[in-house]
């Protein structure tokens, strides 16, 4: 039997009726904000974050109705299924375990018969070692200069999450290692990046699960040619974040470093995987810190 569509549930119809009421002029946000207790009633704190929805056109009844709908759709049970490794992407037969990248409790997370945590910890530790070697100068550019710039090359979820986090935490960034993002195939984006960097001190981080994404490879090829034109070996200043066995994870054409992505982590949720951990650990130094608050 197929599952009832959400818009056929009585809880949905209750919300529709409530929405009509909330669209009345007396429920305008400017009137709702006159309530001095509104901020306390419409906010949450946790994990070092403050969530404020007091500026949304909702009241306590709205939230109660939304919670009723969530209960009818078994949101908590489905979330528990997701974080425990259940198949929640039936079209591809995959788990969705971005949450596992935020775990530091040592507990296993099973996908079928496999505990995925050892592989996640292995990548996490490898990224930590790599970023440490960049920061202490053990790893340098092909001419022996310390890295001063990191350019993330990607598109969609392969760059957007890391860029958001980098901007939000830029006051804590390492001022000696500037982070740049190259996502647009418009030549102006590439031109702006190369104007801001020194090729001898630039580390290129190319992020693509398949390593066949047309836009990402177009920019990666531009970057490689930019380096070659200046007498530099692009592979010695290249890091790839990609699926194991992809063209970007080729032992016959090795980059300075390569970190694997997992098929159970989708692009838009990948910031706490190597996708975000590599650039953010280089810019923000402490690899575990960006992921720890998100556990809650």
Residue ranges and their predicted role:
Residues 2-4:
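Expand to "…catalyze enediolate/carbanion chemistry for C-C bond making/breaking, isomerization
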Residues 6-14, 18-143:
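Extended, charge-enriched "interface" segments that sit outside catalytic cores
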Residues 32-34, 153, 291:
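Single, functionally critical "micro-switch" positions that shape active/binding sites
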Residues 129-137, 144-288:
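Glycine-rich phosphate-binding loops that contact phosphosugars or nucleotide phosphates
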Residues 286-296:
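Single conserved hydrophobic/aromatic residue that forms the stacking wall/gate
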């Amino acid at each position: 039997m197929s599952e009832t569509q959400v818009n056929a549930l009585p809880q949905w119809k209750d919300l529709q009726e409530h929405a009509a009421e909330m669209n009345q002029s007396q429920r305008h946000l400017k009137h709702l904000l006159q309530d001095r207790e509104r901020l306390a009633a419409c906010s949450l704190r946790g994990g070092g974050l403050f969530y404020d929805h007091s500026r949304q056109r909702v009241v306590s009844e709205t939230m109660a109705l939304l919670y009723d709908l969530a209960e009818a759709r078994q949101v908590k049970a489905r979330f528990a299924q997701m974080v425990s490794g259940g198949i929640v992407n039936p079209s591809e037969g995959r788990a969705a375990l971005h949450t596992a990248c935020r775990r530091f409790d040592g507990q296993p997370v099973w996908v079928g018969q496999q505990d995925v945590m050892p592989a996640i910890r292995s990548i996490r530790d490898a990224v930590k070692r790599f970023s440490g070697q960049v920061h202490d100068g053990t790893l340098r550019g092909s001419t022996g200069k310390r890295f001063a710039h990191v350019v993330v090359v990607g598109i969609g979820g392969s760059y957007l999450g890391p860029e958001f986090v980098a901007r939000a935490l830029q006051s804590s960034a390492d001022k000696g290692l500037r982070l740049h993002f190259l996502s647009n195939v418009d030549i102006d984006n590439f031109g702006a990046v190369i104007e801001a960097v020194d090729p001898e001190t630039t580390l290129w981080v190319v992020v693509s699960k398949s390593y066949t994404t047309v836009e990402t490879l177009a920019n990666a090829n531009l970057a490689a040619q930019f380096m070659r034109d200046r007498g530099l070996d692009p592979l010695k200043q290249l890091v790839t974040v990609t699926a194991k066995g992809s063209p970007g994870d080729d032992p016959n054409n090795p980059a300075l470093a390569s970190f694997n992505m997992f098929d159970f982590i989708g692009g838009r949720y990948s910031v706490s995987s190597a996708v975000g951990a590599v650039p953010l650990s280089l810019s923000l130094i402490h690899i575990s810190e960006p992921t720890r608050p998100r556990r809650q």
